[in-house]
Amino acid sequence: MATEQRPFHLVVFGASGFTGQFVTEEVAREQVDPERSSRLPWAVAGRSREKLQRVLEKAALKLGRPTLSSEVGIIICDIANPASLDEMAKQATVVLNCVGPYRFYGEPVIKACIENGASCIDISGEPQFLELMQLKYHEKAADKGVYIIGSSGFDSIPADLGVIYTRNKMNGTLTAVESFLTIHSGPEGLSIHDGTWKSAIYGFGDQSNLRKLRNVSNLKPVPLIGPKLKRRWPISYCRELKGYSIPFMGSDVSVVRRTQRYLYENLEESPVQYAAYVTVGGITSVIKLMFAGLFFLFFVRFGIGRQLLIKFPWFFSFGYFSKQGPTQKQIDAASFTLTFFGQGYSQGTGTDKNKPNIKICTQVKGPEAGYVATPIAMVQAAMTLLSDASHLPKAGGVFTPGAAFSKTKLIDRLNKHGIEFSVISSSEV
């Protein structure tokens, strides 16, 4: 409930940023959802009132909502001003943090939210940030009874919830899953805003600290159920999808593994092994990506190399990333398919000595990943946090999407909003 002390259910922080403007549009759509009994009280937050006002005016024009600007609160807030972050958090039930790269700008928002009793959702795809925040703030968030949920965009809700969906649909014990991401584009091709590119550069350039963080965490290994899932070669051919694939370098594997650990340790659910890949089509695409990958991995090791990668994203990514981001036509024509191939054991079959005897294939399909599916996932995660509290983990804390939402109706919400989960096949072998 909105109150005088906390007047907004949702606050979109960074609403005037490239991704934030799309999240703002999605919240505006949710505000007038016919299934809602009342209007959603919400606000946008950022450094410039003029920029925030322009974002609201643009959304109003696009959605045919001329009165939108007068219906939405505006909060002036600067990541460099902790007092302004406190004031924002005091007014929100849930903060949707769209300000990245999160390794530089994410922690002050989380700290302000915890100290002032607001929950926070972000769309980070940065494993080091996500794992560090869980290590530093899980107990503090639990003490305050608030939920800090990272990676709630395309990274990594489709993968994390997709594995849970696959497990729920298997008539037996799921032990291992491989996922294959396929990105579909229209005649004008693909383009991704360079904010994502920067996050990848900083993440790959700091792999040693991620390893140190995991050593400090000193977590016990999760038990291995069934045969160990074999890693594919850096370039492999997927017969089922009739195309080549490479390992997916996003946060999905890190997030899914953390979820599986939580479900095993807290809910006594059998852990699932997981590997993630992205399909790249034919041999020409493979060669192109090999060169791009070699360039990236060479330059990202050095400070001056990282500066060059950041300054010339279009050149070093072979045209996939740009400072301008995608056009509306590119966004409208794009979509994704995430295909899961799972294996496990039918009910009553022992997992110790027997080979897996059941297979399942599921899919998650949706619109353009970065600026349509991500806002949908983020906003529906927030709405689930607001409306399905009885099925969340009992105490607050820092969670992955799967850990927070495995018992909620988030998958149903996503299905209704264009991110569709389905079973393709299931069979005993």
Curated annotation (Swiss-Prot):
Database matches in InterPro entries: NAD(P)-bd_dom_sf (IPR036291), Saccharopine_DH-like_oxidrdct (IPR051276), Sacchrp_dh_NADP-bd (IPR005097)
Pfam families, alphabetized: Sacchrp_dh_NADP (PF03435)
Residues recorded as bearing N-acetylalanine in the entry: 2
One GO cellular component term noted in the UniProt record for this chain: platelet alpha granule lumen
One GO term of the biological process aspect: glycolipid biosynthetic process
Family indicated by similarity: Belongs to the saccharopine dehydrogenase family.
Protein name, entry field: Saccharopine dehydrogenase-like oxidoreductase
Gene for this chain: SCCPDH
